[in-house]
Amino acid sequence: EDGRAVPVFNDKHLSFRFDHAQEMVKLSEQLGFPFMAGSSLPVTFRLPSVELPYERPIRDALMVGVGSSDPMDFHALEALHSLIDRRQGGETGVEAVQMIEGDAVWRAGDDGAWSWELLEAALSRSNQLQGISRTEAKPQDLIRNGQLQALVKNPAAYTVWFRDGLKTTMLMLNGAVGDFTCAVRLRDPD
């Protein structure tokens, strides 16, 4: 109670209720401390340690996440944005968002709504594949061995269309992975 204030970082969004979030901001202003919210994933370590070059055109991107809806999909979305916002033209705004769950996710992949190739690339970077990778310490290809659909009981897919034409997909694959991975397909600058 010496009258000093320290900055506060609130992991994820401020609250699931707008009135609670407003109260948190109001208190930070009254008490005079800097207040920020967001995900810590955009600033955590990456394996491999990679940053997309600034101003590179991106064709599409796919993020794989794990965890319950709301807190963990927020982390996946912010981690994805930390990569794609470096693209040519930067952040231009969101045009539309669609979320689907269950078997519709696999059908959407089969129909080309999201890329199995990008999913394969993202899964190849996972340090925490589940199934026999975990129980028997065996490497596996979750897509080709048919285990992906067996391990993931209720997949969720978020597709985000941006105003500059970029389309991204975020797949929440509880049961298949224990970490967050991403794959980005660059567009030829010409």
Listing of model-derived features with the role each one plays in the protein:
Residues 176-190:
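C-terminal helical cap and adjacent loop that interface with cofactors, partners, or active-site loops
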Residues 61-166, 172-176:
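Rossmann-like dinucleotide-binding domain that binds NAD(P)(H)
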Residues 29-32, 36-61:
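Rossmann-like NAD(P)H-binding beta-loop-alpha module
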Residues 20, 24, 57, 76-79:
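Internal, well-ordered alpha-helical segments in soluble enzyme and binding-protein domains
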Residues 21-22, 48-50, 108-112:
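Short aromatic-enriched loop/helix-cap "lid" or pocket-rim segments at secondary-structure transitions
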Residues 14-16, 41-44, 67-70:
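Solvent-exposed loop/turn segments at secondary-structure junctions
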Residues 2-5, 55-56, 89-93:
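Short helix-terminating capping/connector loops at secondary-structure junctions
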Residues 1-39:
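Beta-strand-loop-alpha-helix segment that lines the small-molecule cofactor/substrate pocket
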